[in-house]
């Protein structure tokens, strides 16, 4: 099993400039899911995707002329593995001096390698120079929790802060906070994010929810793992009928990671970059 501490994170790395798929370092999802009460071999109570965006992708055409593009990768949450982010960066950089016939050929190669590493089917989209000006930005929709004037003293995940008034009629609500911060599982480097929680069910106590989200501030876990922990804690403590959790994290090493988890059928998020990304 690939363990996070064996990944390139926190270690000096030689940057290869010619294509090398072996740089990708997959990490199994299951151990962290076991931690949040999801045993191996049983269905998980959510589905979704991890949306990655790469802003530093370059290669050479067959004449040796550099090419650049943005790339997005949609990794289903039911793949057995995630990709450790530094290894992803090193892999993408390995294309820098690699001659490739066309953007389409690169897209096919990325699809193959990432699908192999994750154990599923990864969608790949390239945005070449001609379309860069068409890229749009947008913020997460929803009622801003950060408006609340609260006192905070918990900085490790505290699901007991969550509650919902089960005596009230169900509501449909979308809540947003830009105060999510966690830390890399291996290096402890800060990860900054915005999070959107959509639900149908008993009204969730908003002050408690904001305190809970802030409680991740000193917590060490990868982005995907944090979002699944949030999903499970809200489900257990607040018991919504429907729940979707979406986080957009700021980029590091030219990559941002945006996990989405839901228990009801809905369109995947539209992947608009927000102002902090």
Curated annotation (Swiss-Prot):
Q: What is its EC number?
A: 1.7.1.13
Which GO terms of the cellular component aspect does the record hold?
A: cytoplasm
Q: Which SUPFAM superfamilies match?
A: Tetrahydrobiopterin biosynthesis enzymes-like
**Top-level taxon in the UniProt lineage:** Bacteria
* Any one biological process term the GO annotation gives: queuosine biosynthetic process
Transmembrane feature ranges: none
Q: Which residues bind NADPH?
A: 85-86, 252-253
**Active-site residue list:** 184 (thioimide intermediate), 191 (proton donor)
Molecular function (GO) terms for this protein are:
preQ1 synthase activity
Q: Which UniProt keywords apply?
A: Cytoplasm, NADP, Oxidoreductase, Queuosine biosynthesis
- A single Pfam family, by name? QueF_N
The chemistry this enzyme catalyses reads: 7-aminomethyl-7-carbaguanine + 2 NADP(+) = 7-cyano-7-deazaguanine + 2 NADPH + 3 H(+)
Pathways per UniProt: tRNA modification; tRNA-queuosine biosynthesis
Name the enzyme's class. Answer: oxidoreductase
Name the Gene3D superfamilies for this protein. Answer: 3.30.1130.10
> Where does the UniProt entry say this protein principally localizes?
cytoplasm
Which intervals of the chain form a coiled coil? none
Q: Where in the cell is it found?
A: Cytoplasm
PANTHER family reported in the protein's UniProt record? NADPH-DEPENDENT 7-CYANO-7-DEAZAGUANINE REDUCTASE
**What does the UniProt function comment say about this protein?**
Catalyzes the NADPH-dependent reduction of 7-cyano-7-deazaguanine (preQ0) to 7-aminomethyl-7-deazaguanine (preQ1).
| NCBIfam families given in the database record | QueF (TIGR03138)
**Protein family:** Belongs to the GTP cyclohydrolase I family. QueF type 2 subfamily.
Protein name per Swiss-Prot or TrEMBL: NADPH-dependent 7-cyano-7-deazaguanine reductase
Identify the species of origin.
Cupriavidus necator (strain ATCC 17699 / DSM 428 / KCTC 22496 / NCIMB 10442 / H16 / Stanier 337) (Ralstonia eutropha)
């Amino acid at each position: 099993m690939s363990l996070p501490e064996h990944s390139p994170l926190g270690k000096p790395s030689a940057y290869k400039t010619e294509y090398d798929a072996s740089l990708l370092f997959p990490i199994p999802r299951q151990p962290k899911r076991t931690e949040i009460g999801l045993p191996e071999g049983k269905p998980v109570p959510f589905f979704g995707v991890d949306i990655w965006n790469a802003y530093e992708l370059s290669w050479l055409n067959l004449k040796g002329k550099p090419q650049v593009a943005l790339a997005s990768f949609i990794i289903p949450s039911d793949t057995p593995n995630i990709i450790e982010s530094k290894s992803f960066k090193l892999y993408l950089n390995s294309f820098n001096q690699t001659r490739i016939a066309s953007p389409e050929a690169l897209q096919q190669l990325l699809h193959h390698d990432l699908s192999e590493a994750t154990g599923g089917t990864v969608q790949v989209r390239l945005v070449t120079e001609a379309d860069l000006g068409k890229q749009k930005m947008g913020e997460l929709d929803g009622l801003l929790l950060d408006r609340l004037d609260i006192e905070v003293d918990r900085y490790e995940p505290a699901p007991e802060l969550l509650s919902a008034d089960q005596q009230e009629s169900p509501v449909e609500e979308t809540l947003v906070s830009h105060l999510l911060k966690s830390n890399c599982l291996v290096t402890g480097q800060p990860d900054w994010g915005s999070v959107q929680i959509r639900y149908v069910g008993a009204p969730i106590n908003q002050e408690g929810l904001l305190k809970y989200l802030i409680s991740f501030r000193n917590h060490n876990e990868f982005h995907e793992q944090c979002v699944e922990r949030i999903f499970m804690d809200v489900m257990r403590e607040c018991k919504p009928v429907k729940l979707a959790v979406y986080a957009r994290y700021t980029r590091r090493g030219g990559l941002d990671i945006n996990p989405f988890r839901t228990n009801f059928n809905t369109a995947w998020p539209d992947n608009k970059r927000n102002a902090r990304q």
